[in-house]
């Protein structure tokens, strides 16, 4: 990690510690710096660690505790913005994904659809492209992103069950190395999506997670809209198509065909 980003990460973690958040802040060496070197001049860092267990995704209590913790740290995670560390523009990313899906459609049409995956893709891609375009037209993402950057809002970037440690009544959060200045709904979406995939997209648990987050950090109308767009965008569909195109196009597993159909 670049020293400047590491320094900013430590600044963020120290700010969070001051607000009684349990986070894996770095430890400075005798010279007061974050990066040390061993006898072979290999750089390393040392961090606070916690004796706890990972969030158990089979436990509703753990899930909701993790969601409330995310909402709590989001209220604190702000620094003066550095555009070098801004997250990717979601609208630009969706436009690029749409272009890639169109490219894959052209490729299959040109060579001819032979297997089940290719035939199903040609049957369904137009609907997904139209859905994706409609999502982009209705979103207020541009203004929400601008507001988030102006306020210096920061995303964890890798908030999942592996980086949430349950310590009895308390919760620690680790591995902030993927942090960025961004719309914080990105964290909430990624965590919820991972959980919902394990729960067969159970709306009941989805509502509980949203309520838990909103009870700690109330969501604005733009943030609700942004979450809706993220969940409605055919991200999984794009990933399957992109995997097909970038890997061996002649070999498509039955599992991927089934995923495309569902």
Where does each model-flagged region fall?
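ATP-binding pocket architecture of kinase catalytic cores
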Residues: 1-83
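ATP-dependent phospho-/nucleotidyl transfer catalytic cores
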Residues: 3-4, 55, 84-154, 259
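Helix N-cap / loop-to-helix initiation motif
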Residues: 22, 219-223
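Active-site acidic catalytic loop and adjacent metal/ATP-binding pocket
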Residues: 26, 136-186
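A glycine-centered beta->alpha junction motif in the catalytic cores
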Residues: 44-57, 79, 103-111, 233-251
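Active-site activation/catalytic loop segments of kinase-like enzymes and analogous catalytic loops
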Residues: 185-218, 231-250
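Charge-rich, low-complexity terminal tails
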Residues: 250-262
């Amino acid at each position: 990690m670049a020293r400047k980003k590491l320094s900013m990460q430590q600044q963020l973690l120290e700010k969070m510690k001051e607000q009684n958040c349990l986070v894996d802040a770095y430890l400075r060496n005798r010279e007061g710096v974050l990066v040390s070197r061993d006898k072979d001049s290999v750089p390393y860092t040392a961090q606070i660690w916690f004796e706890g267990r990972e969030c158990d995704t089979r436990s509703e209590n753990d899930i909701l505790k993790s969601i409330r913790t995310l909402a709590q740290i989001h209220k604190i995670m702000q620094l003066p913005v550095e555009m070098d560390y801004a997250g990717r523009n979601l609208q630009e990313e969706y436009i690029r994904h749409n272009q890639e899906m169109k490219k894959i459609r052209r490729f299959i049409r040109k060579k001819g659809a032979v297997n089940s995956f290719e035939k199903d893709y040609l049957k369904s891609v137009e609907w997904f492209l139209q859905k994706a375009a409609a999502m982009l037209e209705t979103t207020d993402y541009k203004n929400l992103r601008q507001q988030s950057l102006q306020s210096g809002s920061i995303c964890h970037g890798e908030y999942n069950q592996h980086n949430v440690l349950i310590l009895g009544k308390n919760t620690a959060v680790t591995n902030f190395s993927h942090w960025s200045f961004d719309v914080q709904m990105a964290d909430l979406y990624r965590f919820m999506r991972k959980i919902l995939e394990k729960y067969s997209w159970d709306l009941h648990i989805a509502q509980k997670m949203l309520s838990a987050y909103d009870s700690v950090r109330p969501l604005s109308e733009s943030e609700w809209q942004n979450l809706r767009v993220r969940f409605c965008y055919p991200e999984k569909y794009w990933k399957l198509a992109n995997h097909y195109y970038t890997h061996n196009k002649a070999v498509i597993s039955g599992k991927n065909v089934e995923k495309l159909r569902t």
